[in-house]
Amino acid sequence: MADGTIAQDQAQSQGIWRVREGITSALGKEGAVYKYDVSIPLAELYTLCEVMRARLEAHGALVTGFGHLGDGNLHLNIYTPGRFNKDPAVLAAIEPFVYEWIAERRGSISAEHGLGVMKPAFLRMSKSESMIELMRGIKGLLDPKGILNPYKVLPPLSHS
């Protein structure tokens, strides 16, 4: 952990949120951004940034991270200054490595914003089949017709 801030009042809290919301937007003006919202043990929260910096240096990608100290949530942002199209070689250097690294530390590949369309295939790296089935059951209770974010929440049923 390099630095941290605890808001002392409502105004400071709002200021912190403005900065937080502006980071990814600002990075997007510099180049393509690869965003990951992950949860890892607090002791290794920033280690992932350091590991990814070393891994992506040859690709000219830069890495920044910020998050929630209390719950181990890291917003990992990787960007390619001056290159606005996502590069398959950069993506291949990130995935599945980033998910494997997180799984080895018993973290979660999706901390707070859901799986989207890109992560369901990787969910089994950080969640057991029984946990995924429990998640599927809860989703079924809350959305019995499957109309909320269809195909973006859970991976297909395993046939193993």
Regions found by a protein language model. Give the residues of each.
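C-terminal substrate-recognition/cap domain of FAD-linked oxidoreductases
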Residues: M1-I94, W101, R105
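Short proline/glycine- and acidic-rich turn/helix-capping motifs at secondary-structure junctions
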Residues: T5-V19, S110-M125, L154-S158
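A structural signal for short, well-ordered beta-strand segments
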Residues: Y36, L76-I78, H113, K119, ...
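Flexible loop/turn segments at secondary-structure boundaries
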Residues: D71-H75, R83-K86, G116-K119, P155-S160
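Alpha-helix-loop-beta-strand connector modules within alpha/beta enzyme cores
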Residues: P96-V98, I138
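Alpha-helix capping/hinge segments and adjacent helical runs
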Residues: A103-L115, P144-L148
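Activity-critical C-terminal alpha-helical subdomain
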Residues: P120-S160
